[in-house]
């Protein structure tokens, strides 16, 4: 079975628990923290996949490292560890965040721009493009790419809206050539 499908099942179960316990915000915050901790400490994942370390020691490590996270998140991590699927945690986190955002009417987006965008500019992008994708609002991450020259390229899911100067120049070039 595809790893993404498996991760989505665990994420869905955790999401249901979050809704039942009315702790969606807290659990999402914990899931984001776990994802970031694992991204910054790749050797921790390697340590947990070491066959020389007993399951009990691995569980103790997870309990110690993630002592501050909520019980549902910690229990999910321990369950994944028992089932030798701890490597799914980053994908599970992405899937959980997507479910939480969908429930709130929020979409994740990345805005590529030649310079850092102000909060007002990010809000204006959110206001305009949220309606286009049928969401209440967008959570936009700004990535600076000077090669865009000017304008903005916005990625929402698998859609790309290219309003950059370099994108316009490429379109003009394609029209002239072919």
Curated annotation (Swiss-Prot):
PROSITE patterns linked to this entry: ATPASE_DELTA
MF (Gene Ontology): proton-transporting ATP synthase activity, rotational mechanism
Domain of life: Bacteria
This protein's UniProt keywords: ATP synthesis, Cell membrane, CF(1), Hydrogen ion transport, Ion transport, Membrane, Transport
Topological relation to the membrane, as annotated: Peripheral membrane protein
GO cellular component: plasma membrane; proton-transporting ATP synthase complex
Pfam families: OSCP
Localization (cell): Cell membrane
SUPFAM superfamilies xrefs: N-terminal domain of the delta subunit of the F1F0-ATP synthase
Family matches, as InterPro entries: ATP_synth_OSCP/delta_N_sf, ATPase_OSCP/d_CS, ATPase_OSCP/dsu
Main subcellular localisation: membrane
Quaternary context: F-type ATPases have 2 components, F(1) - the catalytic core - and F(0) - the membrane proton channel. F(1) has five subunits: alpha(3), beta(3), gamma(1), delta(1), epsilon(1). F(0) has three main subunits: a(1), b(2) and c(10-14). The alpha and beta chains form an alternating ring which encloses part of the gamma chain. F(1) is attached to F(0) by a central stalk formed by the gamma and epsilon chains, while a peripheral stalk is formed by the delta and b chains.
Free-text function comment from the UniProt entry: F(1)F(0) ATP synthase produces ATP from ADP in the presence of a proton or sodium gradient. F-type ATPases consist of two structural domains, F(1) containing the extramembraneous catalytic core and F(0) containing the membrane proton channel, linked together by a central stalk and a peripheral stalk. During catalysis, ATP synthesis in the catalytic domain of F(1) is coupled via a rotary mechanism of the central stalk subunits to proton translocation. This protein is part of the stalk that links CF(0) to CF(1). It either transmits conformational changes from CF(0) to CF(1) or is implicated in proton conduction.
Entry similarity comment: Belongs to the ATPase delta chain family.
Protein known as: ATP synthase subunit delta
